[in-house]
Design a protein with these regions (language model features):
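The alpha-helix within a helix-turn-helix
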Residues: 15, 26, 55
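DNA major-groove recognition helix of helix-turn-helix/homeodomain DNA-binding modules
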Residues: 30, 47-64
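Short alpha-helical DNA-recognition segment
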Residues: 19-38
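A short, Lys/Arg-rich alpha-helix, primarily the initiator
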Residues: 1-17
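Helix-turn-helix DNA-binding elements, focusing on the entry/boundary residues of the two helices
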Residues: 11, 22, 33, 48-51
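Interfacial/linker helices and their anchor residues that mediate assembly or domain coupling
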Residues: 67-103
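Residue-level detection of the helix-turn-helix DNA-binding "recognition helix"
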Residues: 16, 30, 41-43, 70
């Protein structure tokens, strides 16, 4: 999996590699084809459950698609910020801290 591709680019390329139409994926996932099209174009964000459906359909490791989906959310949130690296360092530290107090 290419780490630079967005979630939408990944699911579109997988669909095209398997020569599947949007309507076929729609039938397999129970997600409207217009919604899938918006996922592929990055115009709409799927839920975790929907991401897992795509992983199953395309026979991809769930972790790969979850990482792509989550990293897209972070990237889009930070795209206009100036101190991205510092924000990510602090966020990583906070995640580690929160995991220790969550136990």
């Amino acid at each position: 999996m290419c780490l630079m591709k967005t979630f939408g680019e990944i699911i579109r390329s997988k669909r095209e590699e398997q020569n599947l139409l949007l309507r076929e994926i729609s039938a397999l996932t129970s997600i409207d084809q217009s919604v899938i099209s918006k996922f592929e174009k990055g115009e709409r964000k799927p839920s975790r459950e929907q991401v897992l459906k795509f992983a199953e359909i395309y026979k991809m490791p769930q972790a790969d698609l979850i990482i792509s989906w989550q990293s897209d959310k972070v990237a889009y949130e930070l795209i206009d910020e100036n101190d991205v690296e510092e924000i990510l360092k602090v966020a990583e530290s906070k995640v580690k801290y929160l995991k220790t107090i969550k136990k």
